Regions:
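Short beta-strand element of the alpha/beta-hydrolase
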Residues: 67-76
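N-terminal cap/lid segment of alpha/beta-hydrolase-fold proteins
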Residues: 21-65
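Mobile cap/lid helix-loop segments that gate and shape the active-site cleft of serine hydrolases
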Residues: 43, 189-224
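C-terminal catalytic histidine-bearing segment of alpha/beta-hydrolase fold enzymes
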Residues: 245-298
Length: 298
């Protein structure tokens, strides 16, 4: 166990010194709630299927960067795949250009064959990612109070879940590290698990087709907002025919009802998947404008 811990630490040090992209396993030892299984993960040009061994790809900006902000990025994929290429790595590189440290999370996909409780496995991974970044903030030149989370589509649901369920630790956290993201940036997110709002595939993959009303309520993040929910940036296209814009609208309303700082940018056209749609090509500029207003970038 000591050897495993040392190797994990060594990976951190090498990553920090090199200032370059490095992939590390998300957990030092056992993965929480993991069932014994054959690893069937498949990579199709950055779109991952059957993910059961989560990892974190670390993108650090130039070491002389004055910006001390970090973002954990949760790609989308309907909790069926992880679209890490255009909703992860490409975004991380853009964050680096602004001096922001970025961490692309390849989280576990809910699967009864690999997880004891598949509904919490992605949340465990998101909490662990926040903990890893915060525990190593000094080493990586990050302000521990400027660690946010960003998510796309179902990854937006995961990010919003991390931002509304942080008071309960679903992972081992002996150090008592805060699992609360300091801000959220949600891009065409799935927010709700309620039948009239949700993306059916995301709901069924995460919670199952016969989820109880209590479970649907728990993972409907518009119903979990409190005064302590982090400040939030939302963006969505009104013609999104995959994830209804009502998800973002309801979350924005819930945030404002609790006096949480929130900014929402809507596009009349853009469909689902901004990184591939020229109609909504300014969305990332809106993100950085908001980050500047929040004093997260220069």
């Amino acid at each position: 166990m000591k050897i495993i811990g040392f190797l994990f630490y060594l990976l951190f040090v090498l990553c920090f010194c090199a200032g370059a992209q490095t992939v590390i396993p998300l957990y030092e030892g056992a993965i929480p709630g993991e069932k014994q299984h054959e690893n069937k993960e498949y990579d199709d040009n950055g779109i991952y299927s059957f993910v059961s061994k989560p990892d974190l790809t670390i993108y650090l900006p130039e070491v002389d960067s004055k910006v001390k902000t970090a973002v954990v990025i949760c790609p989308g994929g309907g909790y069926h795949v992880v679209c890490a290429s255009y909703e992860g790595h490409k975004i991380a590189k853009e964050m680096n250009k602004k001096g922001v440290a970025a961490f692309v999370l390849k989280y576990r996909l809910p699967n009864d064959n690999t997880c004891e409780n598949k509904s919490i496995a992605p949340l465990q991974d998101a909490q662990r990612a926040i903990k890893v970044v915060r525990d190593n903030a000094e080493k990586w030149g990050i302000d521990p109070n400027q660690i946010g989370i960003m998510g796309f589509s179902a990854g937006g649901h995961l990010a919003a879940t991390a931002g509304t369920h942080f008071s309960k630790s679903y992972i081992e956290n002996k150090e008592g590290t805060s699992l609360r993201p300091d801000f959220m940036m949600l891009v065409y997110p799935v927010i709700s698990m309620q039948p009239e709002l949700t993306h059916g595939g995301s709901r069924d993959n995460l919670l199952g087709k016969n989820a109880s009303s209590e479970l649907l309520e728990l993972f409907s993040n518009e119903k979990q907002v409190t005064e302590k929910t982090p400040r939030t940036f939302l963006t969505h296209a009104q013609d999104d025919d995959v994830v209804s814009v009502e998800n973002s609208l309801r979350f924005y309303e819930a945030l404002k009802a609790k006096n949480v700082s929130a900014d929402m940018h809507l596009f009349s056209k853009g469909k689902h998947g901004y990184p591939l749609e020229p109609a909504a090509s300014n969305w990332l500029g809106d993100v950085f404008k908001w980050m500047k207003e929040q004093e997260l970038v220069d």
